[in-house]
Amino acid sequence: MAENLSDKVREYVKQIQGRTIDVAKLRTELKIDPSSPAWEGIRVIIHRLVEEKILKPSGNQDGIYKVITQVKPVRVFLPGRERRPPFDLKFPRDYDKGLQMEFSNDIVIREGDLITLGGVKSKGKTTVCLNFLAENIDLNPVLMGNEYTTLIDGEYVPSPRFIDRLDKMSKWVNWVDDEGMDKFTLLPIREDYAEHIVKNKINIIDWINLEANQLYDIGKVLEDIKAQLGRGVAIVALQKGELSEGARGGQFVRDFSDVELLLDGFSDNSDDILLTVKGAKEKTAPILGKTYAYSIVDSGTKIVNFRQVIKCPECYGKKYKNGQPCDTCRKTGWKDNEPF
């Protein structure tokens, strides 16, 4: 009888790994008769499961236990183990030059990677996201966003601004297949992003919005997204403060980013953008901290004049010299990194 009860308890907790359980619930779920020896005998079984590291007491002496998720060792050098190549993610291009953002040649993207894009409000996050979508359209990417759709009569439809941008980009991007069906999937998602990730696909999220008192949750949100990617990758846009050195969420964002890019204003023209390579876990050249400038044209659809820039050697990035606007950098604080 005791062994039979033990088997029942083990089978039950096996089904609820990662959750919590208490003695009373176990008795109820297993329909144990209060007058039977099993009523108290279940405590012996629980004690045994604690010793076997199947259950863990809460520590509050309240009879609550966490069911520990069981794992098996992973053999690394298994005969015939496949070596997966880098993920062939195409970065946005300079429309006029036809070349991908030059730093992308020095970044290695792997399956399951997460690219975060921290951008100041109205500084081109959507432009970068849509260009990622366009460059990888033949891989049938997934696009989620809180400004791409609008609710009309109980049904989500593409927002006017979004479809206008796609119409402009259709001059150089084939958004549909031969049968007229979308070559990408648009999901009207504004929360619970991880639950809607499409495994083994490029998932582009523009953008994740969290309340100010929830920014510490961003690490968990990004971790959950990564866990669902399979052999796909994610590109996630996040808001960034004007003078901050990272996306909102700070270190929590950096902890889970395989590549971290930042977007700021470059000049008094709101369509001039400064891109900083803040982080990259796998790279083939020293690119961290490098900065690039470009302009956005044609209603936020094209990236042009993409080039590397460095801090102005005359004003040291301060935009002014001797109380006057710096002529060398035209009051941007930056200068094109021209080859010698």
Enumerate the language-model features and the residues they cover.
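Conserved inter-motif catalytic segment of the P-loop NTP-binding fold
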Residues: 4-7, 16-17, 105-110, 119-120, ...
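N-terminal pre-Walker A segment at the start of P-loop NTPase domains
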Residues: 74-103
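Short amphipathic alpha-helical interaction segments
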Residues: 36-48
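Short acidic, hydrophobic short linear motifs in intrinsically disordered regions
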Residues: 18-33
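Hydrophobic positions on the alpha1 helix immediately C-terminal to the Walker A/P-loop
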Residues: 128
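Short, cationic-aromatic polyanion-contact patches
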Residues: 60-81
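Phosphate-binding/switch region of NTP-binding enzymes
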Residues: 117-118, 122, 216-314, 318, ...
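A short, conserved structural fragment
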Residues: 50-60
